Amino acid sequence: KNQNIYVKEVATGKEKQLSLDGTLGNYYSAYIRWSPDSKKVASCKIRPVEKRYVYYVESSPADQLQPKFHKQEYAKPGDELPFKVPCIYEVESGRSIIPSTELFDRQYEVYGPEWNPDSRAVTFEYNQRGHQVYRVLELSAETGKVRPLVEETSDTYVNYTRHFRHDLKDGKQMIWMSERDNWNHLYMYNRITAQPDYQITKGEWYVREVLRVDEDNRQIYFSANGMEAGEDPYLIRYYRIGFDGKGLTCLTPEEGMHRAWFSGDMKYLVDVYSMVDKVPVAVLRSARDGKVVMPLETADITLLEAEGWKAPEVFVAKGRDGKTDMWGLIARPTNFGPNKKYPVIEYIYQGPGDQYVPKTFRPYDWNM
C-alpha cells in the first residue's frame, strides 16, 4: 500500500513496512513473491511513464454540423517505456537488495521475478527494446549481483513470442527453447555454469510448442513441424522425447495437420487431424507410442460432394532461389471444365510474419 511493500503477521495483524521509498512516480509492484523459506519477498520497483496522446479532427460527425476534436491515448515508436527493477527484501531484518541495472537497462519488458528453490536467488527475464537481445538473469539474494544464465542475441530479431523455459525442481538445470542454430530446438541448460549441458532436440525441423514436461519420467511432450521428409513442412505433429535427447517418438504418425489434447495423467491423447483434401478424423491414442486405442469419428462429406464440391489441389514448386520448396493450393471453380481457359488469381502473402495457406480441411475458404 502507499506504493510500498508491507508484510502483516496473520496471527496478530501487526504490519511491518519493508520499503520506504515508493512514490507514485516510482512505486513497488503488487506482484510479490515469497521465498520458499518464507524469509524474504521479491518484487519489482516500477518507474511508469506519462500517458501519450494523439489528436485528430472528425470533420463530418453524424450527429452535428461542426467538426469534433478527439484525443486518444497512443504510444509511438521511440517513446519511453516503463522501467522495472527486481528487488528483494529480508522480512526479519528489513534489508533491501536493489541490483545494478546494467544487464537490463534497455527494457522492452522485464518478466518476473520468481524464486529459485533454495531461496538464495530469484530469476527474471529481460527482453531488450528492439528484440535483438533476450536474457534470463539471476539476482542473488545474498550479494545483490545479477548474472546471466542465458543470453540470446540476433542481428535481426529474437523471437521472444516462441520461447519456452522450464526450471527443473532441483534448481540445477532448466529446459530452454532457442533458435540459435537457425531452427527452434530445446536445450538442457546448467544453471550453475550458465551454459547448455547439451541439445535435447536437433535437426532441420522446428519445435512449435512444449505441451508437458514430465520430470518424474524425464519426458518432454511437444509439437513440431518439418520433421517428416517430403511433407509440407507446416503440417504439425506431436512427439515425445527423453530429457537426454533419446527415444524420440512420433505420437501422431499419419500425414496431416494434427491437433491433440492430452489426458491429465498423460497416458492418452485425443488427436484430430485432416488436410485440405482429407476429411477430419478423430482418434484416441496412447501417449506412449501413438498407437490408436479407439477410433472416435470421421467426417462425412457425402452431401458436400453431392453439391459438386471439389477439394483444392496441393502443389509444391521451387522458390526464386531454385532450392526452397513453396507449398500452395490450386482452387478450381465447382463447374471447372478441363478444356476451358481460366484466368489465374494469385493470392499470396510475401512477408515473414506468418503463413496463410490453409492446411486443414474446410468446406470453403474466403481466400478461395
What annotation goes with each model-predicted range?
Residues G112, S119, E125, C250-T252, ...:
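Serine-hydrolase catalytic core recognition
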Residues K1-N4, E9, A42-P48, K76-E80, ...:
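Beta-strand C-termini and the immediately following turn/loop, strongest in propeller blades
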Residues V49, Y53, P61-P196, R208:
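Beta-propeller domains
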Residues T23-A30, F104-V110, S154-R162, G203-V210, ...:
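Short glycine-/Asp-/Thr-/Trp-enriched loop segments that recur within the blades
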Residues K1-G25, R106, Y111:
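A conserved hydrophobic secondary-structure block that centers on an alpha-helix together
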Residues E15-L20, I97-S100, V146-E151, D197-K202, ...:
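Beta-propeller fold detector
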Residues T12-K14, S93, T143-K145, T193-Q195, ...:
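Short coil turn/linker residues within repeat-based beta-strand modules
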Residues L18-R33, S43-S100, R288-L304, Y356-D365:
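Predominantly five- to eight-bladed beta-propeller fold
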